[in-house]
Regions:
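Terminal low-complexity/charged segments
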Residues: 1-166
């Protein structure tokens, strides 16, 4: 069954222009169903986001999402979902990191990133260097661990009781 709304289309020459603008900080590209993902060197994520926003018109940071791949040396992936309102086009910028290495914060470009980075920190334990308020946002302040990591036990580390009667 086809849908009556237009499908997202590739922007003509966009990937090549991005490759030229990002240079050595661009590690890989992948396009699928009209959406392109760019894998970026961790230390270059702020500049890559600035280029996407200022040179290519991706004005809106829609989401920052984490993913955990325990089999990789840099097990965490941080995904930045950007939208160009003028072109009606989305892209994804991805960086990889390990537990010890912080990802540079993009709060200088989009202040709303502070909330999104806090969520990734809380659920995966990924630190963001330069985030002015990196504390838990979804779990209790005394919560132990990061619940969306693949090695987090399904029952948690501590039994919590919210009712004195139980």
């Amino acid at each position: 069954m086809s849908h009556h709304l237009p499908r997202m289309k590739e922007r003509e020459g966009f990937v090549d222009a991005c490759k030229a603008a990002l240079g050595a900080s661009l590690l890989a590209t992948k396009s699928h169903v009209g959406e392109t993902s760019f894998t970026i060197a961790r230390d270059a994520i702020v500049e890559a986001c600035r280029i996407a926003r200022d040179q290519f018109g991706y004005q809106q940071l829609m989401e920052i999402a984490g993913a955990d791949y325990p089999e990789r040396p840099e097990r965490f992936e941080v995904n930045y979902h950007l939208l160009s309102l003028t072109e009606n086009h989305r892209i994804r910028l991805k960086v990889s990191t390990d537990e010890a290495s912080a990802v540079p914060s993009v709060t200088s470009l989009w202040p709303v990133a502070g909330w999104l980075e806090r969520e990734v920190f809380d659920l995966y334990g990924v630190a963001f260097a330069g985030n002015p308020d990196l504390r838990r946002i979804l779990t209790d302040y005394g919560f132990e661990g990061h619940p969306l990591r693949k090695d987090f036990p399904q029952t948690g580390y501590v039994e919590l009781r919210y009712s004195e009667a139980e």
